[in-house]
Amino acid sequence: MPPSIADFQIDFGALEQRLNEHTKAVVVNSPNNPSGAVYSEQTIKRLADILRDKEKEYGHPIYLISDEPYREIVYDGVQVPFVPHFHDDTIICYSYSKSLSLPGERIGYVLVPPAAADSKALYAAVCGAGRALGYVCAPSMFQRVAARCADQTSDIAVYQTNRDLLFNGLTSMGYHCVKPDGAFYLFPQTLEADDRAFSERAKKYDLLVVPGADFGAPVICEFLTV
């Protein structure tokens, strides 16, 4: 669904128009890549209410798949709600590669709450996929390491310092940017119409910039703050 560029929050009117009897799941990513937006408890409650109403209308579960690799990387006291508290039919996908600053290490978990419809079948499907897709099996050593680091995070204060420096610098130069509440990206609007040309020129200055068109939001570019 096209993002709301004004604040990168859910456009509930547009969402309801797109839900139909064929909808099996809705995917949310909060804290969000690339905008850094975080969905509040109020937002998740409203989304859950809509999905429950649609489940009753269509007579089948609509799963809310919550992609949460940046769960711990939030700023200024922002809280990330625990989605299963608001919608039973939830599946959570998590990765330690972000919380432990291990980019490229694809190790994490999929949570299927017991309250989810057909939870045993979902669990079996997740396990089966992990066995069948051998290239996604996490190395046994890193499984042991991750278990011992489960309650640890990288230094979030460093990310916040970088966010503030980049946000203040870009906005002082005239860029419009929604201040991220989480993750480690900024998603400012470029000062020209061609986001790809802007990204190419940025390479000359050793800047890591991704065109917004790759995220369905042209005329915006993603900046990495790490």
Regions found by a protein language model. Name each.
Residues 1-226:
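PLP-dependent class I/II
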